[in-house]
Amino acid sequence: MVDSYDDAFDGEKSKTQIKRELHALVELGERLTTLKADTLARLPLTDELRKALDEASRHTAHGARKRHMSFVGKLMRVQDLDAIHAVLEQIDSSSRQYNERFHGLERWRDRLIDGNDEDLERFVNEFPDTDRQHLRSLIRHAQHEKARNKPPAAARKVFKYIRDLDETQRGLR
């Protein structure tokens, strides 16, 4: 029996696969244009690509931007994509961790304002550097604001105090 499958085509990519890969490079280039300058500095990019990414913000017309992003995609072909993806994953991971910590602090604030002395005791156990008197005062003000349906200025102060304690405990301050 003769097999019609030809082994010569195993290594070649189809036109569709090539287009998918190029489109993925353009999308990665689009993502890079949204990053801040200090974040871009951490990425292993060529000077030509850095210049093209900087110029991308100047192209506002749809056609010009699309054409320029195709150029960025072309420049992306010679980049170390694994290194770029690794740095972007690290950035995403640290951003996720920051957001999770931020939401945890918001939950603490809400429990302290809505809660009782048990919640305050748990908080003080977790954050031993807490100035109880100051925190109780902030909580009391926030509770009064909440009862009177006023804007949450005191609740913001409670959050800021909690965030400062957290940053001090983590050595970020």
From Swiss-Prot:
Give the domain of life.
Answer: Bacteria
Q: One GO MF term, please?
A: ribosome binding
User: What keywords is this UniProt entry annotated with?
Assistant: Cytoplasm, Ribosome biogenesis, RNA-binding, rRNA-binding
> Record's Pfam families?
DarP
- Where is this chain's protein located in or outside the cell? Cytoplasm
UniProt-listed GO biological process terms: assembly of large subunit precursor of preribosome
* A GO cellular component annotation in the UniProt record: cytosol
Cross-referenced InterPro entries, in alphabetical order?
DarP, DarP_sf
Q: What does this protein do?
A: Member of a network of 50S ribosomal subunit biogenesis factors which assembles along the 30S-50S interface, preventing incorrect 23S rRNA structures from forming. Promotes peptidyl transferase center (PTC) maturation.
Protein family membership: Belongs to the DarP family.
**The protein's name:** Dual-action ribosomal maturation protein DarP
Give the gene symbol: darP
